[in-house]
Amino acid sequence: MSSSVTSTKYVLNSFNSVPRLSYAKSIDIKDSLTDLIKIQRDSYNAFIGIDQNTESGIKNIFQSMFPIQDLLGRAVLEFVSYSIGEPQYDEYECIKRGITFSVPIRIVLRFIVWKVQEVSFKEVKYVVDEETSEKSIKYIKEQEVSIGDLPTMTSHGTFIINGIERVIVSQMHRSPGVFFDSDKGKTYSSGKLIYSARIIPYRGSWLDFEFDIKDILYFRIDRKRKLPVSLLLRALGLSNNDILDTFYDKIRYVKSEKGWVVPFVADRFRGVRLSHDLMDSDGNVLVKANTRITLRMARKLANDGLTKYLVPFNEIQGLFIANDLLDSTGNALIISAGENITSEHINKLELFNIEEIFVLNIDFLTVGPYILNTLFLDKNVSYEDALFEIYKVLRSGESPSLDTIKAFFDGLFFEKERYDLSTVGRIKLNDHLGLNVSEDITVLTKDDIIHVIKKLVLLRDGEGSVDDIDHLGNRRVRSVGEFIENQFRIGILRLERMIMDYMSSVNFDNAMPCDFVNPKVLATVLKDFFSSSQLSQFMDQTNPLSEVTHKRRLSALGPGGLTRERAGFEVRDVHPTHYGRICPIETPEGQNIGLISSLAIYARINKHGFIESPYRKVDKGVVTDKVEYLLAMQESNYYIADASATLDENNQFVDDMLYCRHDGNFVMVKREEVDYIDVSPKQIVSVAASLIPFLENNDANRALMGSNMQRQAVPLLKADAPLIGTGMESIVAAGSGTVVLAKRGGIVHRVDGLYIVIRAFDQEKNEYLGVDIYNLRKFQRSNHNTCINQRPLVKPGDYVKANDVIADGSAIDQGELALGKNVLVAFMSWQGYNFEDSIVISSEVVKKDVFTSIHIEEFECVVRDTTLGPEKIMRSVPDINEDSLSHLDDVGIVNVGAEVSAGDILVGKVTPRPPVSLPPETKLLVTIFGEKVFDCVDSSLYLPLDVEGTVVDVHVFVRRGVEENDRSLLIKQNEINGFIKERDYEIDVVSEYFYDELKRVLVSSGVQYNNQNIDDYLASIPKKEWWDINLSDEAMLLQVKDLKEKFDSMIQNAHSKFDQKIDKLNYGYDLPQGVLCIVKVFVAVKHNLQPGDKMAGRHGNKGVISRIVPVEDMPYLEDGTPVDIILNSLGVPSRMNVGQILETHLGWASVNLGKKIGHILDNLDELTVSHLRNFLYQVYDGQDLKDNIQSMSDEDLLVFAERLRDGVPMAAPVFEGPKDSQISNLLRLADLDVSGQVDLYDGRIGEKFDRKVTVGYIYMLKLHHLVDDKIHARSVGPYGLVTQQPLGGKSHFGGQRFGEMECWALQAYGAAYTLQEMLTVKSDDIVGRVKIYESIIKGDSNFECGIPESFNVMVKELRSLCLDVALKQDKDFLSNEVKD
């Protein structure tokens, strides 16, 4: 397929982001970047099928499974059609309820029972219809049957399983087909290459072929014991003669008076040293003996007319006879096929007067005797013996009949039920072996196996080369649709077996199709896959970029893939075919490095699972706009130029010679020979890496860290798009699913914090399309506890086009990805507080909540029905004073908006307890004072100790059939009010449009009523009565009638949707067994920046905040502006991520240009708009936007300039960033020093630093490694079973490890007692820590240290090595040692 290259024009409106000053030279193919999760969506759609007419995975599975008939053939169950229903609840309702977002699958089955005369164990005699001569039907029953629910993909490419969003990661695995390989000389010390071949199916047994050190060819099935390949060939039905005929050419030798006359073939004499004179058939010597003949010499002899040459009688000794040689009677065998001709055989030839023989073309140079040698290992084995030998290896211990063995062998490779190459495997096999077998034949054929052996023998003979398994032509991607299809097939096969079993025992007369199908079978298989598969992963929802990246991830791990322990360096390494397909940068840093990767920006996956990359076609040195997608295998045949190649105004290459990629190498070719050119310099990298400006100036390791850390950035309180971006920010935001995109074009009717209502309207056709209502997500919790909050960008009256961003999400600013903040940074050391990547920040940053983030914590309270009675939610909790309950409502549930802190009750709950007998004095007090005695215990939901925040939402789920409490009813009523609001919005928009249209029609009719103008008359009556006005014009009457029908239909549709929502709400909740009610409380926690939090830039420059310095102590500029962050300049040279410095300089220019524009705007009394326009010309010099600025009105120009006050947004695309001279020009334009350095003053003493400092604006991110989530305290806690040392980590409530270096520190300062305390009682001295506990209770501060348990463990380990070590504590023992 091909697409075209396009560019866009900026449109000034309130909801578009400010255009970036871009340094990109290439033109993007925008249509390839509009849908970043197309891979997931297309794969799933291919599985379910858009409609019944298209081929789909589901349809193919049903067609392959049915018809099913019983064992005796009395009845058959046929598949007619399938249908996929609508989900019961929408995506967010499923998340809220904690259920799976799924659709019901129903199939129409036809059950046919035949009329039978007689049934026996061997056969069934049917009643035959006399007219059609076919079996008579007793009856047919057709019914629609449910086979279960299928988890369905959300609009964002995810799955919601039990209320949790999950992603099915695509898997890279070895493509089905045949692969040829060698051991690279590693198996044997001699270094001899051992060649092998492997046929890998999509489903079924693997077939391996391999040589041994003696050049005998063997085969294996499923990696079992190897057998000679001649056994396999005989099992395929080939005799010895057939095998020799198949693998060797024959040479005819005709006897003459002077010797044997042989046809002369020039290629057979290449590199041969003659053992005898080369003579023609007449005996003339052409070449003397011992001469080495070259191919050129041989071909000259052929051209000179040599067609036959003479071989002396004795020179045939050592050749191999091609077939069985019989005497003239045909009874006596002289020489067997394949035998080596000896002197004895030559005498026999003379004796029997043999005039003609055929020998095998084996010269030991270009053709070796490998198949022949293998054949002689088991020369006399028959077809039956071969089958039995193969069966014995695969199924040892069994001795079945020959028919069973044949059926078993056929099922291994030749039956669709047990073996499937898949279409991909067949295509690869055909390409590799040069076959022309139909793609529909997805099992092996005899020819396939023979051709694989032939090619393997050719490899051993030195022809051809082995395959590169890491080449992307040999690896394919399995996406979500394929995984679900495989699981679906497993479930359906289980269902088929159950149907077969049921058919054998059911009475057909009473059976219906629904009796055969158990819907739980399929549901169980799908549930297991989505819940526990290695490739079904909890979605990374930290920020929009992490969502997109997770959906575009490729994993080599998982079922059928590699394991991280066995994966070598080669499979992890970057391969030349990854160019434009898999990102060479983005991969994890740990043990999964290279095994998990990301798809490149423009790459797509074709229907066979291979990755394609786009290129622009080049025709005779001219670059066209036609874009073609190429596979890795296709790409190696072409010369492909780099996107940075210089073009003239006619799109022709300027240079005569260009560097091009060809077959994995870089070569210099003429421009006329170039076939394609890259579409963009950034097509090599992934989405995350494409967001790093000046990527080309960073070391690859740091770029890897930068792309990974962007995915860890926490969405901040107020999003701020980067001043220095790459131009990909808006594309990533739109493709993430976090923003709200307009489904259709139209006019914004109403906007508030919860809804956007758009009157969908086609401006070109002037056609009304309906009403689109968008519900905005407010303060919802993501998978990683970050806050999802959508904010509208549009205002009433705005006209939006389809796919315009109408509402921002978390970490989105004006439709652009905004993961961090633009902050003023100085590169310098400061009192040692930024040593080793530590970061010093200003208190002003904390005060202004620059890096403050909101996190949503979810707490759940479950009310159960116990054996003593039901638990209850109530406000009057035992032994809790009223002040502690002030934030609860009358029911006992916390109010939304309440500020809660550690230990506060969120839900008051009591649990019944067994009755206790009260002592007499208590009974007396109860009688006198009437005190209530609680027969229950407090089991309320308390806020954990480390949480403090504001309650933002409460969900109450009451079991269907259980009486709802007041809070539950209130929440339900609020939801109903929301539905009413939506319905009324829709009716208002529909009514407004249709009444306007009706009025237009009535006014155009020109009629008058009661001598009134039509406008006045319409204003005097209710709008409902407008429809009843009589019109004399028939055409207008029909027009009004048509409007009325459309109006009624849309109003009815709005009411119908409202009723459906109410029905679903009133349906109630299905809760687990024994659960009466579930209350979920969501608390918004505010995390301010503090020491210990981790921050990073986009260039891998990460660090931990060491100190928050008062703003008055921070270094400041000449104008008094204090810097926000101080970074250590020593962190740049060794890391080689210079991109951060270039970003700093460009950011410095950007902000100061904004200040200059702001100064012009503030002084418009003195300066004119033309002055502003001229300055913007200089800023956007050479940009497409320059034309837009020229065409803007003065009013629009002022609006546009106002948005540039905080800085001019710039784009430095990957590999197309601005040059040093361009950055210098911008600094000069902003009246700055071109060095990018300024004088800084010490905030503590006010003196200027000795030398200038690099200062500028850099985009910093706050990562989700927050100190609040990591720090914890331990007094007592769990200990390890063996070592008896405290466990580690917050989740285990562990201690802090006092490690080797810490021990050195104590030793260095002579703190012996402190060191002893650390290694014993505070660690694993079991007796000592019990004693110290006792002494604390007694108030005694003294303690003794004993023997740590780790010493005892060491002693035990020494004993296991037969070394008995004992610890003596007796004083006499020491004195005896001294005496000795």
Curated annotation (Swiss-Prot):
GO molecular function annotations of the record: DNA binding; DNA-directed RNA polymerase activity; ribonucleoside binding
Any Gene Ontology CC annotation: DNA-directed RNA polymerase complex
Catalysed conversion reaction: RNA(n) + a ribonucleoside 5'-triphosphate = RNA(n+1) + diphosphate
EC number(s) recorded for this UniProt protein: 2.7.7.6
Source organism superkingdom: Bacteria
GO process terms (BP): DNA-templated transcription
InterPro entries referenced in this protein's UniProt entry, alphabetically: DNA-dir_RNA_pol_bsu_ext_1_sf, DNA-dir_RNA_pol_bsu_external_1, DNA-dir_RNA_pol_su2, DNA-dir_RNAP_su2_dom, DNA-dir_RNAP_su2_hyb_sf, RNA_pol_bsu_bac, RNA_pol_bsu_CS, RNA_pol_bsu_protrusion
Protein name: DNA-directed RNA polymerase subunit beta
